[in-house]
């Protein structure tokens, strides 16, 4: 009676080598021929909509957060005084 092959061994090594060689071939850079990529269109001049600098968006977001915190502090102080 032959015993079943143990896990691992020569076949597993062959599969690993084949898998790694296929991954190298699959990871080769592919040229993108689609000129209407939506992710690239966001940063191009062809994008429609409002164009705002990212730094402006950052300052507006921080200003909004600051105003919300200030309103909370004002309401707490006003609640204790009146």
UniProtKB/Swiss-Prot annotation:
Residues 1-53 are cytoplasmic. The chain crosses the membrane at residues 54-74. GO terms for cellular component: cytosol; endoplasmic reticulum; endoplasmic reticulum membrane; membrane; rough endoplasmic reticulum membrane; Sec61 translocon complex; translocon complex. It holds the Pfam family Sec61_beta. InterPro entries: Sec61-beta/Sbh, SecG/Sec61-beta/Sbh. Coiled coil: none annotated. It is found in: Endoplasmic reticulum membrane. One of its GO terms (molecular function) is protein transmembrane transporter activity. Keywords: Endoplasmic reticulum, Membrane, Protein transport, Translocation, Transmembrane, Transmembrane helix, Transport. Residues 1-36 are annotated as: Disordered. One of its GO terms (biological process) is post-translational protein targeting to membrane, translocation. Its main location: endoplasmic reticulum. Residues 19-36 have a biased composition (Polar residues). It comes from the Eukaryota. It is a single-pass membrane protein. Component of the heterotrimeric Sec61 complex, which is composed of SSH1, SBH1 and SSS1. Presumably three to four Sec61 heterotrimers assemble into an oligomeric ring with a central aqueous pore. In cotranslational ER import, the pore diameter varies from 9-15 A in a ribosome-free resting state to 40-60 A in a functional state when associated with the ribosome. The Sec61 complex is part of a channel-forming translocon complex whose composition seem to change dependent upon different functional states. Belongs to the SEC61-beta family. Part of the Sec61 complex, which is the major component of a channel-forming translocon complex that mediates protein translocation across the endoplasmic reticulum (ER). The functional states of the translocon complex include co- and post-translational ER import, cotranslational membrane protein integration and retrograde transport of misfolded proteins out of the ER. In the cotranslational pathway, ribosomes synthesizing presecretory proteins are targeted to the translocon by the cytosolic signal recognition particle (SRP) and its ER-localized receptor. This is Protein transport protein SBH1.
């Amino acid at each position: 009676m032959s015993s079943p092959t143990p896990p691992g061994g020569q076949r597993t090594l062959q599969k690993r080598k084949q898998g790694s060689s296929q991954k190298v071939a699959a990871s080769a850079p592919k040229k993108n021929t689609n000129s209407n990529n939506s992710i690239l269109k966001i940063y191009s001049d062809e994008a429609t909509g409002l164009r705002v600098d990212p730094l402006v968006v950052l300052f507006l977001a921080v200003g909004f957060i600051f105003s919300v915190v200030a309103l909370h502090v004002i309401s707490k102080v006003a609640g204790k005084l009146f």
